[in-house]
C-alpha cells in the first residue's frame, strides 16, 4: 500500500489497550502480550487477535550530568524502588546529592508496568520520592535540571539523533550502567545498547509486541507484517531497538584517539 498514510496515536499503555479492546484502533504496539481476559473480549467482538514480537528495548536509568556515580547493581536498583534506599549516600557514601527522586513518565505507562511486573516481581514501588513527569520527554527534562533525580525510561529515547550509527547516547544526561554482580564497577556494568540486549549483559530488557485485532484483515495487518519484515526490522534497528527477526552481526572495533 505505497499511497497509504498512517495516523499514529501516542498514548500510555492503559489507554492504548482500552482503545484496542473497544476496537477504536486495530493495531497496538506495546511491551506485553494480551491477558486471557483481553483476548476473550476481542474474540467476543469478532476479530481473532494476533500477537507477535517486533523488537526489544531496554529500561534505562538516567541521572543528572553533575552526578558522577553512574554504575549501579541490579540489587541496588531493586532496593531503591522498594524504598529501602532513599538517599544517594546510602548507595555511594561520598555522594552529596541528598534525597533520591525517582522519576517516571506516568502511572499508566508500560515502563512502570515493567518495573512492577518484572523488576519487582509484582510488588508495588515504595520509593518515598516519586515524581510523575507526564511523558518520556518530560522525564529527560526533569533529570536534566534536577541533580538528585534518577529517571526511568525506555532506552530508545536516549539515542543521540545526530549519530546515524545509534552507538552514542545524548550528552545532556548520564545513562547508568547496570551490573548483575554484587559490586558495580566500570568493567562489569553495562549500558542499554542493542548489542548488550542481544548477548544478555544488560539485565532490563523487554519485548515490544504488535497486537493486531482487525476484522477486515486489511491495512493494520499489512503494516504489522511490514514492521516484522526485512525493511521494517531495519527501521526498528535505526530507532535504537533490537529487531526481533533480523540477523544481527556484532563487530568489535578499536578507536584510536
Task: State what each model feature region is.
Residues 25-31:
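Short, structured active-site "lid" loops
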Residues 1-14, 18-25, 50-57, 62-257:
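Exported/periplasmic ABC-transporter solute-binding proteins
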